[in-house]
Amino acid sequence: MEMMIKKRIKQVKKGDQDAFADIVDIYKDKIYQLCYRMLGNVHEAEDIAQEAFIRAYVNIDSFDINRKFSTWLYRIATNLTIDRIRKKKPDYYLDAEVAGTEGLTMYSQIVADGVLPEDAVVSLELSNTIQQKILKLPDKYRTVIVLKYIDELSLIEIGEILNIPVGTVKTRIHRGREALRKQLRDL
C-alpha cells in the first residue's frame, strides 16, 4: 500500500491531479473520522478534512518521500482540527449534535446476532456519553485519546503526527484517561 502511495505522490509532483484523487479516495474516510471524533460536528469535520487534503496537495512538494504519507496527512488534519477547536466559542458544546448518530436510526444500531434492543440502546447511550466526555477533554489530551483509542495508532505514529516525543504521548494518554475517568465517575 505504501509503495502505491509513494508512486502516486511522485505522479502528483509531476502534475498528475488524478493520482491525488486516488490518494484522497484511500484516506478520505480515515481523515474525516479523525476530524469528526475531535470536533463532534459533521459539517466542521467535512470542512477540516477537505482543507487537510487541499493543504496536502498544495504542499506536496515539501513532503519527504522517505517518510510515511499517512503520518504527514494525519499531522495536517490534526493541526487544522486543533486550530478549529481553539477558535470555537466556549458554548459550542451546548449546541453540538450528539456525536456518532448523524443519519442513523436506533434500528440500524441493533446487531443481528440477537442483541436485545434495550442493550443496544444502553450501549449507544454509553458510547454517546463517552464521546461527549472526550469532547470536553483539553485539546492536548483529546487529540492523543482519539488517535490512540479511536484511530488505533501506535505511540510512535502519534508522536510523529503531533511532533512530540513518545514519552510525552504516553504522559498525555495517561492524563487524558485519568481526566476521562474522573468525568465518567458521575455515571
Swiss-Prot record:
Residue ranges of the annotated DNA-binding region, renumbered to this chain: 166-184
Ranges where the record places region Sigma-70 factor domain-4: 125-187
GO biological process, one term: regulation of DNA-templated transcription
Keywords: DNA-binding, Sigma factor, Stress response, Transcription, Transcription regulation
Intervals of motif Polymerase core binding: 47-50
Subunit structure: Interacts transiently with the RNA polymerase catalytic core formed by RpoA, RpoB, RpoC and RpoZ (2 alpha, 1 beta, 1 beta' and 1 omega subunit) to form the RNA polymerase holoenzyme that can initiate transcription. Forms a heterodimer with cognate anti-sigma factor RsiW, which prevents it from binding to the -10 and -35 promoter elements.
UniProt protein name: ECF RNA polymerase sigma factor SigW
Organism whose genome encodes this protein: Bacillus subtilis (strain 168)
Name of the gene encoding the protein in the UniProt record: sigW
